[in-house]
């Protein structure tokens, strides 16, 4: 009996200690760790790619590598979820290069070879460019639309009924919409759409993303290419009707990237994550109430920061993809460099439970040995 009491006292105290550590971790918030995967800077990441300069938008087919828009080199480069470089490199658009991009999983947006575009890009030159494997050479895209005076900084796709569209964020103050013939239908089919009923002077559309069938537009106050403090995020349906404002000013600093967190992402699981181009932080919001929840913090308790943060992406499948991670791109070194990486919660979900189980099983084995002695 003394041995049994001693066992429960020792293992119980250890379990209590672990429980205290767990409670402390929960009250302090989940710790997140960043893993650099690819960079143009030698030694900054396991993989070095000189083509990765100021990477903006990212897209992917369900089982494809990540396609990354390298604005600084006018290229699209491909990486798997572990940062391994794929051999295909695609030249995209006129200088000054690609920004947003989308994967097209429909049979629409046909190209001259008769097949639909697979990946589409927006550019700072005001063009839309498209690629599919039938283009010759396969390492180039083709320009399918040009809007004089436009500066496209983001791209999304969506549908209204059976009709498919492309939506381009234009920092001159518009969301321009294109049909499947790459015709600009902003002033016709979409006349008077994508209007915020409470506009904020000096702010312009900067990024755009389709999340669960609605379009989220990020607005920023821009001076050249440098974001100014502030910003807001609006939600529209794909017809361009205003639904609500998601977030405004507060912690926002030129928002651009946005996504829903994975289901196993610590305290911010399934929450809305918004990346800040202006200060490199990632903010979390409740996807139902739109309440601000906090920032993704590292081991030092401070926000994880990546200068000139662009895309935020989450995947449910793909080659070497971490399904519990948030992938990102950033134009480090004042947009003269590039970084592609992932952010994941630490400890991983279930770690404490496993420790408790290990402690219990280890203590049980010790008691068994004592009782047999």
Residue ranges and their predicted role:
Residues 12-23:
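Bacterial N-terminal signal peptides
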Residues 24-28:
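Sec/Tat signal peptide C-region and signal peptidase I cleavage site
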Residues 29-345:
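Sequence/structural signature of beta-propeller domains
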Residues 348-366:
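A short, hydrophobic C-terminal helix/tail in secreted or cell-surface proteins
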Residues 370-373:
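Short, charged juxtamembrane terminal tails flanking transmembrane helices
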């Amino acid at each position: 009996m003394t041995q049994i009491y001693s066992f429960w006292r020792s293992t119980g105290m250890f379990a209590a200690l672990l429980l205290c550590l767990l409670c402390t971790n929960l009250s302090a918030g989940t710790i997140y760790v960043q893993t650099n995967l690819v960079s143009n800077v030698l030694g900054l990441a396991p993989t070095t790619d000189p083509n990765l300069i100021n990477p903006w938008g990212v897209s992917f087919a369900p089982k494809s590598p990540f396609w990354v828009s390298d604005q600084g080199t006018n290229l699209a480069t491909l990486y798997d979820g572990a940062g391994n470089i794929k051999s295909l490199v695609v030249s995209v658009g006129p200088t000054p290069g690609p920004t947003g991009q989308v994967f097209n999983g429909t049979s629409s947006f046909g190209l001259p070879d008769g097949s639909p575009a697979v990946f589409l890009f927006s550019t700072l030159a005001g063009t839309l460019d498209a690629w599919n494997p039938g283009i010759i050479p396969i390492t180039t895209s083709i320009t399918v639309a040009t809007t004089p005076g436009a500066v496209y900084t983001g791209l999304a796709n969506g549908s209204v009924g059976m009709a498919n569209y492309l939506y381009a964020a234009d920092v001159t103050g518009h969301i321009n919409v294109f049909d499947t013939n790459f015709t600009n239908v902003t002033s016709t089919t979409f006349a008077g759409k994508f209007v915020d009923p409470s506009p904020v002077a000096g702010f312009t559309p900067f990024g755009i993303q389709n999340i669960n069938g609605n379009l989220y537009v990020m607005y920023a106050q821009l001076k050249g290419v440098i974001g100014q403090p502030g910003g807001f995020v609006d939600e529209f349906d794909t017809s361009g009707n205003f639904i609500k404002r998601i977030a405004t000013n507060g912690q926002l600093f030129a928002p651009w990237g946005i996504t829903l967190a994975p289901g196993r992402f610590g305290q911010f699981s399934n929450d809305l994550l918004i990346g800040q181009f202006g200060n490199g932080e990632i903010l979390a919001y409740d996807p139902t109430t739109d309440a601000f929840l906090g920032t993704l913090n590292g081991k030092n308790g401070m926000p994880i920061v990546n200068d000139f943060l662009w895309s935020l992406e989450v995947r449910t499948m793909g080659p070497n993809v971490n399904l519990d991670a948030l992938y990102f791109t950033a134009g480090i070194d004042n947009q003269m460099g590039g970084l592609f990486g992932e952010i994941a919660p630490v400890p991983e979900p279930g770690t404490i439970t496993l420790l408790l189980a290990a402690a219990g099983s280890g203590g049980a084995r010790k008691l068994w040995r004592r009782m047999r002695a």
